Swiss-Prot record:
Residues 130-270 form the FAD-binding FR-type domain. Its EC number is 7.2.1.1. Its main location: membrane. This is Na(+)-translocating NADH-quinone reductase subunit F. The gene is nqrF. PANTHER family: NA(+)-TRANSLOCATING NADH-QUINONE REDUCTASE SUBUNIT, NAD(P)H-FLAVIN REDUCTASE. Coiled coil: none annotated. It comes from Vibrio cholerae serotype O1 (strain ATCC 39541 / Classical Ogawa 395 / O395). Changing residue 76 to A: Loss of the 2Fe-2S center, but does not affect flavin content. Exhibits very low NADH:quinone oxidoreductase activity. Binds 1 [2Fe-2S] cluster. The keyword Ubl conjugation does not apply. It is a single-pass membrane protein.
Amino acid sequence: MSTIIFGVVMFTLIILALVLVILFAKSKLVPTGDITISINGDPEKAIVTQPGGKLLTALAGAGVFVSSACGGGGSCGQCRVKIKSGGGDILPTELDHISKGEAREGERLACQVAVKADMDLELPEEIFGVKKWECTVISNDNKATFIKELKLAIPDGESVPFRAGGYIQIEAPAHHVKYADFDVPEKYRGDWDKFNLFRYESKVDEPIIRAYSMANYPEEFGIIMLNVRIATPPPNNPNVPPGQMSSYIWSLKAGDKCTISGPFGEFFAKDTDAEMVFIGGGAGMAPMRSHIFDQLKRLKSKRKMSYWYGARSKREMFYVEDFDGLAAENDNFVWHCALSDPQPEDNWTGYTGFIHNVLYENYLKDHEAPEDCEYYMCGPPMMNAAVINMLKNLGVEEENILLDDFGG
């Protein structure tokens, strides 16, 4: 009996000793106490926080909202900050978005940096103008088969001081959305029924954040307008979950509340006299509309400009009256739509084919100096790649090719 008791006592003492060792090691290895994050050398911008979390979270907790379209997952590469000291070594997860040269300059992804010690950061001053608003849905209407126009009302007395080409981030709570509950007008239901899309559901167990470019321009006051394409599973792989944020947005009804933050952006027009060529497709319409309206309505620009939009069929064209009106009012602006798959009932007599080919064959091929134009584009990835390849073959420098990756 005494042997058994001795064994139990020794085992207990060993466990207690190991616990003490772990606690001692933790006290030495894991930082405790307050952490100070200095920003831009300005004492008034300094943040005091607790160690252990991510830098992106610490900044957001202090009301400093750094853009992160993926919600902190490390996949979008937007939450770049410059860390002068205290950030530790760069992680492999960051190197997909940050070059070795940028890393030497202190570039990091805030969502991947753990807060372990006092830090010294450099942030763009415009970040401090980013705010968060709870908006109200005005409308959420189909503009094409798979694209809705979400129109949000900003709270009374507030404004979002964005520039044309900018974007906001939408926050979605945990939710369970059934596609069968979507409001899809009869004229668009054919493809939905054909591909049996109403069978899908989207269940999200934690809040998510995604970025969308504005379709309105700064002088359309009091609203935020977005073009949102539903991200359904690909036909050849129907078991892939549908897009979480697009499913949530498509479920919104007039009167619902929706939280956004912003403004963010870098897809801004250059302040030059160069000719502007806009190329869009799908939900890439949004920043194109914002830019063109801003140039012609707010700035009263006299720069030569054209807009080339690609759609599948006439049913997928939208804002036609808007652009027709702008073309009628402004001698320096023309716009063209090309259909890649016009239907018999369309009675289409305009351009057909993919928009990069149409743009080249009907304009740039005979342009006296295509390399001198500025090209602004937003659309599906394949369209973007085709347009960029075509422009580079024409000798257009990268500095004159401006791309918004959020569309399509």
